[in-house]
From Swiss-Prot:
Cofactor field: Fe(2+)
GO biological process, one term: tRNA threonylcarbamoyladenosine modification
Protein name, as recorded: tRNA N6-adenosine threonylcarbamoyltransferase
Gene behind the chain: tsaD
Functional summary from the UniProt entry: Required for the formation of a threonylcarbamoyl group on adenosine at position 37 (t(6)A37) in tRNAs that read codons beginning with adenine. Is involved in the transfer of the threonylcarbamoyl moiety of threonylcarbamoyl-AMP (TC-AMP) to the N6 group of A37, together with TsaE and TsaB. TsaD likely plays a direct catalytic role in this reaction.
Organism: Buchnera aphidicola subsp. Schizaphis graminum (strain Sg)
Membership in a protein family: Belongs to the KAE1 / TsaD family.
Amino acid sequence: MKVLGIETSCDDTGIAIYDVSKGLLINELHSQKKIHANYGGIIPELASREHTRKIIFLLDKIFKEKNIMKEIDLIAYTAGPGLAGSLLVGATFACSLGFSLNIPVLPVNHMEAHLLSPMLEYKSMQFPFIALLVSGKHTQIIAAYELGKYEILGNSLDDAAGEAFDKVSKMLGLKYPSGRELSSLAAQGIKNYFYFPRPMIHHSSLNFSFSGLKTFTSKVISNNTLNIQQKANIARAFEDAVIDVLLIKTKKALYKKGWKRLVIAGGVSANTVLRKRSKDMMENVFHGKVFYSSLKFCTDNGAMIAYLGSLRYKEASVSQLEIIVKPKWSIDKLSYI
């Protein structure tokens, strides 16, 4: 079975084809980052228009180069969470294409796709596991019991980790999108030159809050002369604080469940320091294993949508006639469509 995956939840247009026998066949991605960089952030209306402009181009390219259109058995598309306008572009296109080809169409959850994306490369990855989902809009600790059965153990009460990274980067004068730039700058910083607070690490819950850390960082920036080294020192202190919080909370979740498998997914999972420290923690403290995707699968992509579609096909009701978008669709409330 071959599954066409369509991803348009935010500002990346992703198209991929996954074969259950052969694995990932095609993975095309169009990024809008250069467009939104001019505005310092994502403009939803522009994102929707660019999806509309690029989605046909990408699919036409795939079908002409690979001559594979008649071999598609299922179309999976991101139904949520995400920007309503962007989701609607992908959903409408998927349903229209499914109707024209007379094949089933399946709406899938974007965060579940991120959660399971390491399975594209790690066939040994099994349930149950603890997952740390970290992106621009989500910071969650999830207990994954089995396919479709997830419990949110901890959630961001305000800014997500990725959002905090972007806002602090902007304070330091880095260009959008700036998460990677901040990490590169932090690598040049002097460890413990500044000490930033670790919010909520002593709280009984596994929830996160990064708005206070963001405000603290803003005050440090205002009170210091910002030469390049001082910027690096601030970036280092901020990154260390965020990663400390993420791993302290994750460690508590692992102890709580008694599990030895950890998945880190979402855009922030590309962070080099987070990867290294989580690997060290799992090997040395839990004698377990951490799974994270290759960098190309950390950010939004069609491959994870196609793969999830292949897993979900047998369990979900498939209908290409109903266009479904759920901008606030939580991973613990799938009640699968």
